[in-house]
Amino acid sequence: MICGLLPLLHCYNLFISNQFCYIRSMAQQKTGNEVKEPFTEYGRYSYSDYLGWHMDEMVELIKGRVFRLAAAAPKRIHQKISGKVFNRLFNFLEGQECEVYEAPFDVRLPVNSKKNEDIDTVVQPDICVICDKSKLDDLGCLGAPDLIIEILSSGNNKKELKNKYEVYEESGVREYWIIHPYEQTFITYTLIEGKYMPSKLFTSGDIIVSSSVAGIQLDLEYVFQDLD
């Protein structure tokens, strides 16, 4: 629930920065990324609906509501950081049991039923690591990845900080990393007894060690260098 998230976000206002600190009022508002389309007669869209869409823009489905990924292509710095992180993880995991994927890659997060018509959350994380290969199919991933990494962009900060935090926690994503490319900061959330526990605020010079995927380490000096 958002009430559980607010104290954590407040404690890390340096990470979120001043422009994101209105997240408290956001809980009562629709985000600007929500696609203005009429809902189906039953009130929410499902993955079955999602599969039948032919849209010019990329969208995600979060608890039955449609959100655009961004108004435009991700910024250069976002893509540069994404490429650096993905390449490091791919090289480390090559030949191992776990696999890493980058967007666009559908991650379906079922609540109870795994039927397409019952799934109402389909997201495209910037990067995700899946160690249980039974969750992988031709459509992407069905079930919670072990590790999800999101890189904030100016158009989607609300979605990452509120909506995705909630669905990742509820779905059992064991570890969730958030990278702020312009603040050059990094925070991790580790799932403990069904609730996310935040790390300290990391920045350039720190080494991130994954708690969910053995052996994964990420040097933030490498991630944040040469971004200009």
Show the residue positions of the predicted features.
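Gly/Pro/Ser/Thr-rich low-complexity, intrinsically disordered segments predominantly at protein N-termini
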Residues: 10-228
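Residue-identity detector for glycine
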Residues: 3-4, 32
